[in-house]
Each structure stands twice: as C-alpha cells, then as structure tokens.
Amino acid sequence: MKIVERLQVVLGERSYPISIGAGIIQEDDIFWPLKPGDQAMLVTNKTLANLLKDKVFYHLRKSGIKIDQVILSDGEQYKTLNEMELIISALLEKKHARDTTLIALGGGVIGDLAGFAASVYQRGVRFIQIPTTLLSQVDASVGGKTAVNHLLGKNMIGSFWQPSSVIIDIDCLKTLPYNELVSGMAEVIKYAIVFDKTFFCWLEENIESILSLNHTAMSYCIKKCCELKSQLIALDERENNLRALLNLGHTYGHAIEVHAGYGNWLHGEAISVGMVMAARTSELLGHLKTIDFKRILVLLKRTGLPIKGPKNMSAASYLPYMMRDKKVISGEMRLVLPLSIGKAEIYSNIDKNIILTAIKHSQ
C-alpha cells in the first residue's frame, strides 16, 4: 500500500480530491469516482504512450473499467481546436455516453485538451487529471481552467471545468527531460513570490534537492503549491480578482510564447522571463525593493531558468500581445506586480514607458 497524501479543493458540489504520492497510479482505489463497468477514455500523447500509458490503461482494464484511448501529438503547438476535435471524434466513434469519464495523462497541454473536450462533449462529462510534468502537477491540473491556443493569443478559447479528481504521482517526474523539470520550477517560484515568503526562503535552501528529485523535498514542494492554489480557488474559482494573482509573469511570458511560435519556448521559461519583467516594472515604480528583485533574479538563475527574453523580439513588439491578455478590461492593461517577496497586487494605468523600460532591461 503506497503512502498517499490528500488535499481537498472545496467548491461545494464541484469539490474534488488531490492525491499525492509515489507510484500511486496503480493503486486500486486511486481512480475515484470510477468503478467497475464505467466507461472511460484515456487521453495522452505519443511520448507518454511509450512510457506510462500501459500502466494506467491495463490497470484500469483489469479493474473492470471499459477503457478506450486516444493518443495525440506532443507539444504546445498542438494545443489547438483541431487536436481537441480528435478527442471528440474518438468519443463518438467509440459510442461514449454522457456518463463517460475522460482521463488526462500528460502535462499541461494534454490536461487542457482533455479538460476542454470534457467541458463541451454532450454539454459536459467528468474528467480526471493525472499530471506528469512538474508544471502541471503544481499548477495546470488544479483549478479547472481549460483552453486551447489561437494564432493571435494563448489560451484564448476555453472554459472553466473542474476535474473529478487529481492524481499526482511523483514517480512520473522521472520521465521528464531535465529542461522540462526546470521549466516547471517557474510556477513553483511564482507561488512563493506571490503568496509565501517562508516558502521562498525554503526554496532558496532546497532548490538543488528539488531538482535532483529528492522525494521528501519534491513531495513538500508539490503539496505546498497545491495547498496555496486550492485555498485561492475556493475564494475565487473564476479568476474575478484574487486568482488573477497567479498570472504573475504571464502577461509578458505569453507574449514571448506567441511571438516565438508555440513550442519554441517552454511555458516555464517564458514565465520566468515574464516574472523578471514584472519584478523590474515594480522596482521602477518604487514598489519592489532592489534587494528583493535581486533575490528573485538569483533564485531563477540558480534554478537554471532564463532571465532574458528573445534577442530578436523588440520591447515594442510585446505590447500588442499584452493588450490581448485576458486580464485586459475596457482596453486597459492590468499587470500582476510583486510588492515584496510573498505579496503581489494587480495594477492598471501603468505608464507604457515604464513597461517598455522594464522589458528592455530584460533583453
């Protein structure tokens, strides 16, 4: 029997458990609410089909689940409506009814595609998240945000659709290329900058242990991030105010991802640079102390994350992408800025010249 830590995302009738442990995807009772005789569709990508898919697929089949599968292409460039329609087609071809369950086995891209498909198939079916990347384990799998990209903007087509459960198996991280592990750390550091100075200090002391996949350090890291996000979602499920703080660095970072072409920059890499730009903006405005800015910079560098944007992307070219950000209201850009380590706020009416200067400092 594996040791499983459990958290609960409290959202009334949409509440669901988060299970965290090592080697837990083959535990008999882990796939709640599935039961023998239920229909399910496993959604994964070509890479994980060779690494992890059989562990889940055959375990569920042996458990009496009527399991089918659809294997998608791997990469951010495939987070599209066309790829999502492949899931819908597989559900229809295999005659899945409204009581089916989609199971997302993969990183943020698979989670988004499967979650969005679950939200629209026959007006909504259940889905289970099994995140396999650090980025998806600490962030993307929790909270119910699902989306696909558009050529003009990232995550512009989507919905809020909460999973029935989230199963975080730390052993899945062993399948990750090292740069993907590092990329995921950007979201971990984001939580610390925005919400928890003590956690930031802990990261400064334990970053090497996390990156070496030390079980104790990684378990604590993932659980802490999930706790912070769960608390926030319970207060603001649909990102009307507080939850938007989780977008630290994303307004700048998404501009990099779209401009460079989806998949050319890993999401966490772009967010790392975006957080540097946001921190520099805050410093220029007189909010963030220089000593805190430098601590953020040093931790990102020690993690192996980039702190400078693409050399072929001018500061001015960021602005059109940033104006298409989902936080824009009535034509006014809103940015999440750190005020200190452990505290952030949303600001609008920021002088564009300050934003441009902050971007130039990070090129």
Swiss-Prot record:
Its EC number is 4.2.3.4. InterPro entries: Dehydroquinate_synthase, DHQ_synth_AroB, DHQ_synth_fam, DHQS/DOIS_N, DHQS_C. The gene is aroB. NAD(+) binds at residues 74-79, 108-112, 132-133, 145, 154, 172-175. This is 3-dehydroquinate synthase. Catalyzes the conversion of 3-deoxy-D-arabino-heptulosonate 7-phosphate (DAHP) to dehydroquinate (DHQ). It catalyses: 7-phospho-2-dehydro-3-deoxy-D-arabino-heptonate = 3-dehydroquinate + phosphate. GO terms for molecular function: 3-dehydroquinate synthase activity; metal ion binding; nucleotide binding. CDD domains: DHQS (cd08195). It comes from Buchnera aphidicola subsp. Acyrthosiphon pisum (strain APS). Binds 1 divalent metal cation per subunit. Can use either Co(2+) or Zn(2+). One of its GO terms (biological process) is chorismate biosynthetic process. Zn(2+) binds at residues 187, 250, 267. Pfam families: DHQ_synthase, DHQS_C.
